């Protein structure tokens, strides 16, 4: 008799505490919450937005992955999900294992299980056409997943606020201190040998906006270390076999103007598997800021850009 060795499961869940005021569906759409168990047992909170009166088999669903320390309510995920669920699309937004206070503690390779659980859940709910969207740190997680899983149900990829080459950026733009970088790299390797890769290092890492943040060895090695990290969008993007949309706000103070072009160059290089890619830069005359990175004052232009591109892809 066959036995179940591992499984992905989902069930209805109560809404998380402290939801933003606009975490309400527009007329003609609905919002409910799920608890999803990944194959390794990790519990994922998820928000399912969908148009009313249309069977899932006739709807394209956007599986959304947030950025560093975000969650299922983060911008720009919720504004895209809210707006497009009133235009005939569904969205499944997840809180991945590096959400909120767990930022900079995860292993890059483990987040794949969160995305896998969301994709499998979407298919179990009846959806047959999936778009994978990643924002900020979620862009390289999404790119890795799609590049390494040619699931025909996944039809396209949307990357908002996408970094170019995160290990290089971490060392030379964020940390900007070779002595500190080498100390983090050495301490992380020593912790790995000692079996304590999940424990926070005694050395903090210089991060976004110059903030000194706690970090685990497994996070540093798999995301930030130039030799060991796999969080390199320029490596994964040419291995994606689906159409790709990249969107950046002109006022983005986190992703630098040249970074999307690193991804474009990689996607268009000789031998790339990418069938088509488009880069949309949304005009914004405000000074560069963290708010620009999350499209805080450009939400309508963002949702229009995504909806227009999806329509062109006949999705």
Locate predicted features.
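N-terminal cap/lid segment of alpha/beta-hydrolase-fold proteins
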Residues: 4-55
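Residue-level signal for short, function-critical loop segments
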Residues: 67-68, 136, 250-251
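Short, surface-exposed "cap/lid" segments of acyl-processing enzymes
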Residues: 52-87, 93-98
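Primarily recognizes the serine-hydrolase "nucleophile elbow" in alpha/beta-hydrolase
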Residues: 129-186
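Serine-hydrolase catalytic core
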Residues: 190-287, 296-303, 311
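A conserved amphipathic alpha-helix that caps or lines the catalytic cleft of carbohydrate-
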Residues: 81, 119, 145-146, 264
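Short beta-to-alpha linker loops that shape the active-site pocket of alpha/beta-hydrolase fold enzymes
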Residues: 68, 90, 95-102, 163, ...
